[in-house]
């Protein structure tokens, strides 16, 4: 028996749809299981799906996600409220295709040797200093690439390349490409200090290591979660071994989503 969970944005419209979806799926004989679902239906927007991703990040190999957007077009959500009955029937009766997207692994290590902190990001990780300019060495594949001075760094996944990364002038990458992207935030470039000044696309197995020059407190944002880290030795970023799995019941082309989100359908 398939087990499901429904995650809601928490507003009246989303909560009403959540209740309706739960009732319909239970009527079809599916089991509601908030702890170990086979499929998670996210009702809201992209933020709701990010929340669901982090809630179930420990079982990404066993759980698939599908999104229903109740506001503006959701980049991860391909169903609208008027299609709820159709979606429920598809979940209950139709074998679905699994589409996997890469995610970002972030490991924070500390100078005192205490246990490292590991995170997964669906969209991006941003790294800033709360004490002014961020000054860090950036290593790629174990070799020093540059010393960065500026407001911060953004490391994004392909599916997250349309978010903060795009605002920084980064490229939009198709999620079939297993890579991460490193983009700079307001880097300092003059005759003394130089950075590459362009976004970098790092393929799978290319690790980016960010090592602070001075003793600062880092503000590390993992998607919507903002965390402070002190006494940091390094922050390691790479394509994670895990993937997020989406349940697809119909085509949902990536470039069509990009077009709808940023260009529109035109006249």
From Swiss-Prot:
Location(s), subcellular: Cytoplasm
One Pfam family matching this protein: NAD_kinase_C
GO biological process: NAD metabolic process; NADP biosynthetic process
GO function term, MF aspect, one: ATP binding
Domain of life: Bacteria
Keyword tags: ATP-binding, Cytoplasm, Kinase, NAD, NADP, Nucleotide-binding, Transferase
Ligand binding (NAD(+)): 46-47, 123-124, 149, 151, 186
UniProt-annotated catalytic positions: 46 (proton acceptor)
Catalytic activity: NAD(+) + ATP = ADP + NADP(+) + H(+)
InterPro entries: ATP-NAD_kinase_N, ATP-NAD_kinase_PpnK-typ_C, NAD/diacylglycerol_kinase_sf, NADK
UniProt keyword annotation of Nucleotide-binding present: yes
Single GO cellular component term: cytoplasm
Class of this enzyme: transferase
Cofactor: a divalent metal cation
EC number: 2.7.1.23
Function, as annotated: Involved in the regulation of the intracellular balance of NAD and NADP, and is a key enzyme in the biosynthesis of NADP. Catalyzes specifically the phosphorylation on 2'-hydroxyl of the adenosine moiety of NAD to yield NADP.
Family per record: Belongs to the NAD kinase family.
Stated name of the protein: NAD kinase 1
Species: Bacillus licheniformis (strain ATCC 14580 / DSM 13 / JCM 2505 / CCUG 7422 / NBRC 12200 / NCIMB 9375 / NCTC 10341 / NRRL NRS-1264 / Gibson 46)
Gene: nadK1
